[in-house]
Amino acid sequence: MPKMKTHRGSAKRFKKTASGKLKRGHAYTSHLFANKTKKQKRHLRKAALVSPGDFKRIRQMLDNLK
């Protein structure tokens, strides 16, 4: 059986932390900032962790990622 390949689109969007969790960026950050509040824009700048419900599925796509 051939080796599993890392999903390259996911590899660009997620980073592993030292404890093994996955960091992700927020959505809604590419344009239309005039319609968003300062608070909303400030919170969108911070990275977030992948939720436990999605973790297993994303980890399978990133199996070979270091």
UniProtKB/Swiss-Prot annotation:
GO terms for biological process, alphabetical: translation
Keyword Lipoprotein part of the UniProt annotation: no
Biased composition (Basic residues): 1-26
GO CC, any one term: cytosolic large ribosomal subunit
One function term, GO molecular function aspect: structural constituent of ribosome
Pfam families assigned: Ribosomal_L35p
Keyword set includes Ribosomal protein: yes
Keyword annotations: Ribonucleoprotein, Ribosomal protein
Domain of life where this protein originates: Bacteria
Disordered as annotated region, ranges: 1-28
Protein family according to the UniProt entry: Belongs to the bacterial ribosomal protein bL35 family.
Name of the featured protein: Large ribosomal subunit protein bL35
Native species: Geobacillus thermodenitrificans (strain NG80-2)
